[in-house]
Amino acid sequence: MVYLVDDETVVREALAWLLRSRRLLSEGYGHAEAFEAFLATRDLVADWPDAPVCLLLDVRMPGTSGLVLIERLIERGLIELMPVIFLTGHGDVPTAVAAVKRGAFDFVEKPFSDNALVDRVQQALAASSEAITRRRARQLRQQSLAELTEREREVMTRVIAGLANKLIADELDISVRTVEVHRARLFDKMSVRSAVELANLLREADG
């Protein structure tokens, strides 16, 4: 899905036609406030759709500008899941460049080449797909962490600290065999084969 936010109806219609001709779905909004109202109707961070999305956004619009909107998207944590491509006139190129430095995916200067724009849209959708995959994997890791027992968590903190099974057993006042069982269950639940993999996975889950 490609969201279009531009105050010029003729631009939105032309973009929609172009995207439709390339078999890309789109949905248009005449101003940033309308798009924000759409976003407010759903918790996109907690329940992001499986299909990739991107946003074609005009830099200058009456009311909320594209620059203000992208700042709000950044605040909501949506900028990776929904890459933003700015549509800009020649005089706004420096502004668009600054927006890219803030997190926008890219900008396209008007008048633009159809093929060039579609190429950037497809690249943005690919980036969205990758971000959705990373997010889903992170959610699964966090779910696995939530399913650990208290004892498995105690063993886990010591495993990633580099403690040997004997030391873990002494600290927790349990047998080495019991530590081995908890360690095996921990590795199985977290789908890892070593303490190094476990430590790396936990860092990714926190990210």
What are these regions (language model features)?
Residues G30-H31, S65-E71, S194:
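Acidic catalytic/metal-coordinating carboxylates
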Residues P94, V108-V121:
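C-terminal output helix
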Residues M61:
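Receiver (REC) domain active-site loop signature in two-component systems and cognate sites
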Residues A184-G207:
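Basic, Lys/Arg-enriched C-terminal extension of HTH/homeodomain DNA-binding domains
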Residues L57-D58, T88:
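Active-site residues of response regulator receiver
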Residues D43-L57:
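Active-site beta3 strand of CheY-like receiver
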Residues L67-E80, A98:
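Short amphipathic alpha-helix used as the core "switch/output" element in two-component signaling
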